[in-house]
Amino acid sequence: MSIGILGKKLGMSQFFDDQGRAIPVTLIEAGPCRITQLKTSDIDGYAAVQIGFGDTREKLINKPSKGHLTKSGEVLLKHLREYRVEGLEGLELGAAITVGSFEAGQKVDVSGDTMGRGFSGYQKRHGFSRGPMSHGSKNHREPGSTGAGTTPGRIYPGKRMAGRYGGKKRTTRGLTILKVDSNRNLLVVKGSVPGKPGALLNIRPAKRVGSKPAQGGK
């Protein structure tokens, strides 16, 4: 199934395999999510499934969203995501999507917003080297030259300089699920994922495994 699931990053820990090796893992509280809309090719032009996740207060949901969510029997859902599918067989409006749709050993792609670090210098933001620290140098952490002189007489767009660092949507691909805990809605994923603890994550079956497209992935 190409439908993913929404979850919340709980933090990192370590997982011991059968050989006693410590493996860094991320704990994700995934779902349960509700199917809030089913889109069909006849009506919408393509087939897709929309799911909702996360509790919120009623006053934070506007009337159009409240009317949309009422159709599936759910009103207080904070986050909505859509997944394109080839067919809608076996899917029902209001049905729950849980971690049971994943299994240990499966490859997944995890998307989220990276940690925001505010306005940062070019060294922290881009990993540039610093200037000399002695021999009278005053250029310790300054950016240095940013372009030519009279021609072109400007700084080209995209020049790597100081600015806001982090807070970007990123995807970590090909992570392995080491354990699925259906009782606590937990996914134990090998490695790290974007975001800080509490961040919203989108977990989808991997589109590629190695150099080949994953079976059922698009």
Swiss-Prot record:
GO molecular function: rRNA binding; structural constituent of ribosome
Record keywords: Ribonucleoprotein, Ribosomal protein, RNA-binding, rRNA-binding
Domain of life per record: Bacteria
GO cellular component entries: cytosolic large ribosomal subunit
A Gene Ontology BP annotation from the UniProt entry: translation
Assembly and oligomerization: Part of the 50S ribosomal subunit. Forms a cluster with proteins L14 and L19.
Full protein name: Large ribosomal subunit protein uL3
Lineage: Bacteria, Bacillati, Cyanobacteriota, Cyanophyceae, Synechococcales
